[in-house]
Amino acid sequence: MSEMTPREIVSELDKHIIGQDNAKRSVAIALRNRWRRMQLNEELRHEVTPKNILMIGPTGVGKTEIARRLAKLANAPFIKVEATKFTEVGYVGKEVDSIIRDLTDAAVKMVRVQAIEKNRYRAEELAEERILDVLIPPAKNNWGQTEQQQEPSAARQAFRKKLREGQLDDKEIEIDLAAAPMGVEIMAPPGMEEMTSQLQSMFQNLGGQKQKARKLKIKDAMKLLIEEEAAKLVNPEELKQDAIDAVEQHGIVFIDEIDKICKRGESSGPDVSREGVQRDLLPLVEGCTVSTKHGMVKTDHILFIASGAFQIAKPSDLIPELQGRLPIRVELQALTTSDFERILTEPNASITVQYKALMATEGVNIEFTESGIKRIAEAAWQVNESTENIGARRLHTVLERLMEEISYDASDLSGQSITIDADYVSKHLDALVADEDLSRFIL
């Protein structure tokens, strides 16, 4: 679990997301409160429930990007889902309980990686011994059993030194490795993924653990043996319990496009993928117990962050019970021309940096001038205003169009430098930006 302070979290998010300070502060406080809660005594800790967040803002302003970056910072079980993928219980489609099942699967994977990393040093020692046993087979007694030697032989120590120095990396050896489990593909109808995974694991267990002799270079064998030995040192039952604890205490669920499951106007007939989904989400957000293949998971202390553009629907169109369970509202602002300029230059891996790096692979040096950046930002903002406002995503469309000619001819331009200034941008984009009909189809 992350121990970063809210200021540190916001500072980290600032490296990738421009503006939206209110949203960054809210998620930073929510993340820090997870850590604060774990410092309380057990009785009080059980009473402190997370304050779920609803992020409201037009498309392309950074809602989903905040979720993506938060997943890396959280160091906790995290899952991002689209609200539109779910249907009401009893209808064809995914049920909302699968959110918690997927979150638990992600937690098991995360905890397994951490456990393997924790045992890595011991696993390396065991893998080294197995390779040395192949290079210098241990002595056997009259009954064909391996004798336990008090001290390793001089030859074994010499080979160990060579192995550690990488002198034997390219030498081929034949070694017994765990065979891959029997793969069984099962095609199941939507909504029955849980049964499918249980059947697959059952068929895999039928085969048992078999060994298979493989001929490999020592450096490749070492990697596989370390993984195999580390997996043996991990207790599967303990791992499952740790994963469930991690989900229950630190789990974070990000639900995107929640505005798409709002009921719009008066409609007759069942609304199975809108209001029905909201009703099914209620117990999860409020706190219930969900059955997963790893065990029962309580959702009382899982943090839910929902987001939506709410361009047609309004937050008040959500059913009242769900509104009450999303107490923190954060409004994200529409992006301006100056925001677009900052997006093109400030983030660690901004779009302009990506294009420069891609063209550098062909030996072409691209330089974006300040006037060029400003003109690109103005063009993107202008197209957003005259057609549909898709926020920062418009920059990708505009830049792709601008760089199309260079990308096509890059292999013939090796060794050249190209400067993208205001004149270059105007020459390639002005006609398209000015013609609204062309903008709708091309930009």
Swiss-Prot record:
Alphabetical GO biological process terms: protein unfolding; proteolysis involved in protein catabolic process
GO molecular function: ATP binding; ATP hydrolysis activity; peptidase activity; proteasome-activating activity
A GO cellular-component term linked to this record: HslUV protease complex
Intracellular or extracellular location(s): Cytoplasm
Keyword Nucleotide-binding attributed: yes
Binding-site residues, ATP: 18, 60-65, 256, 321, 393
Keywords of the record: ATP-binding, Chaperone, Cytoplasm, Nucleotide-binding, Stress response
Record family assignment: Belongs to the ClpX chaperone family. HslU subfamily.
Listed PANTHER family: ATP-DEPENDENT CLP PROTEASE ATP-BINDING SUBUNIT CLPX-LIKE, MITOCHONDRIAL-RELATED, ATP-DEPENDENT PROTEASE ATPASE SUBUNIT HSLU
UniProt-recorded name of the protein: ATP-dependent protease ATPase subunit HslU
Organism: Escherichia fergusonii (strain ATCC 35469 / DSM 13698 / CCUG 18766 / IAM 14443 / JCM 21226 / LMG 7866 / NBRC 102419 / NCTC 12128 / CDC 0568-73)
